[in-house]
Amino acid sequence: LNARLRADGRTLPILAAIVVVFGIIAAGNPTFAQAGTYAAIFAIAAIGLSLLLGNVNQISIGQAGFFGIGAYAVAGLTTAWNLPAWLSWPLATAIGVLIATLVGLGLGFIALRFRGHYLAMATLAFGLICVGIFHESKALGGAIGIEDIPYPQFGVLTISGYPAYWFAWALALIAALLTLNVLRGRSGRAFEAIRNDELAAEVLGVPTRRYKIFAFAYSGALAGLGGAMYAAFLGIVVPDAVSVQLSISLLLMVVLGGSGGVSGALIGAALIGFLDISGHQFENSREVVYGLLVIGVVIAAPGGAFGVIRSRFKAQPLPARTTPANAAPRAIAMPVADVAPLAVAHVTKRFGGLVAVNDVSFTLARGTLTSLIGPNGAGKTTLFNAISGVGRLTEGSVQIAGSDVTGWQPHRVAALGVGRTFQNARLFGEMTVLENVVAGAFRIERSSFAADLLALPSSRA
């Protein structure tokens, strides 16, 4: 994670410089300017998908649905409202992004029930449902779609043609910076822990379900923003433009560029944009060309184009400490004296007809070390699972510092100060030693997703 973020931070200014140089070159070439504009639009949507796929390990083949929500919101509202051009587009865009975010929250909640290819199929179904709604809704123009969408306007400046290139890439780079803020903060560490080992993350205090939903909502918001810009700059939206093929194209951008960061999404979108410029030479075999390209990348560079760059940024050793650490220990809030730290009462766990734990009761005294001893198969791990929230109880209750935690999720139990290890070590294999240690402090950090997004001081605590 550290090497990935460092590579992202150093690559992003280089990509910004390339955008500027290409923009200067495209000043006299409308085809280049238009291709660059749409590359920026798709890059915004790809950034969200890259976070979802590469950092949270949640695949989505329905991003075109969010893209379409943003596009149709802008198309429908700007053509229906009798508002000044400088006001209608920002307001319609905000509404479209908000709707896409809320739909992302809902899809994220539903997606908690699915994993692997089942999740891919569920998100694919979402995308197909959205296309069906767009196609059949008379209010949205049906199969014809909505046309005559006004260009964004700020004062006397109309954002179309060549100015649209700079506007689109400005928003794309802002989206990249905001996403990089998230990945550098507490939320980014939570995402990475979930990707490496979801159960280990949960027992360390990471609310994995909540962060998965956050990831879906954020990716939906960025896709909605991309769709809003697409509608405004193209001037027309039809259902076929936001079909499953677009979802696959966005996934292709992430695979080619490299998932798990922002630079890879920008690179992937630029590569596809370049191919589209020269695509007239293989218009009838585009899918074949894209397929061969993906196969080549998977074989030669599994991490995508950015993975090759990232491989040069290995984790660096920590600098030697130049000032002595404060020897004073941090004050620890102790529970109320007359409340037992842990009380287990009549805990029973059955697996069908097999009784793994039978009517176990004990109370731990403060300041003592207690051992649970038994042969293999005696139910020790099952009891630990019951106490830590990993496994559901059949009967009985567990109290921690006077609070009944029976049936609680593991991250809520961890928030009360109960930690656990596993019989087999569960390390976050793609994180450094320091990052593994820092992950254990997640429950005592106080930053939020919004604070990480805006890089507020609490996100650096």
Task: Please report, for each region that a protein language model flagged, where it lies by residue.
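Transmembrane alpha-helices and adjacent helix-loop boundaries
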Residues: 1-325
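ABC-family P-loop ATPase nucleotide-binding domains
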Residues: 431-461
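Conserved Walker
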Residues: 381-382
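The feature captures the beta-strand-to-loop junction immediately N-terminal to the Walker
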Residues: 373-375
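Helix-to-loop junction immediately C-terminal to a conserved catalytic motif
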Residues: 388
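Conserved ABC transporter NBD signature motif
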Residues: 396-404, 416
